[in-house]
C-alpha cells in the first residue's frame, strides 16, 4: 500500500496526479488498490480538488462515490466546488452539488463559489451556484 500513496516533491500521490491529468482508468485502478482519498498535496489539495479544477467530472464523481470529502478545504480555504467555479467547469459543478457539496461555504475573505464564478466571467456557473444556494436556504 505504501507505493500507491507515495508522494512526489509537490506532495502529489499517484491518485492526485491521475485525477489532475484526467486519467480515469488509472484513478479507478488506484482506488481498487486502496489509494488514500484524504491525502493532500503540499498546497492542501486532495485528488478531488484537482479533478474539480481541471473539469474531470467523471473522476470527481468516482472520488465522491468512494467517499472523498466534497467540502474539503485546501491551504487557501478553497473547496473543490470553488475551484470548479473559478475555472467554469459546469458539469463538474453539477457533479459536486449532486454529491452534497455546499454552495454557501466561504473562504476567509467571505468569497463563495458563485462569487468566484461571477468574478471569472462564468455566468452559467454563477447562476447554477446561486440557484443551489437558494435551494439550500429553502430546505434548511
Q: What does each model-identified segment do?
A:
Residues 25-26, 58-59, 91-92, 124-125:
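Conserved ankyrin/ankyrin-like repeat signature
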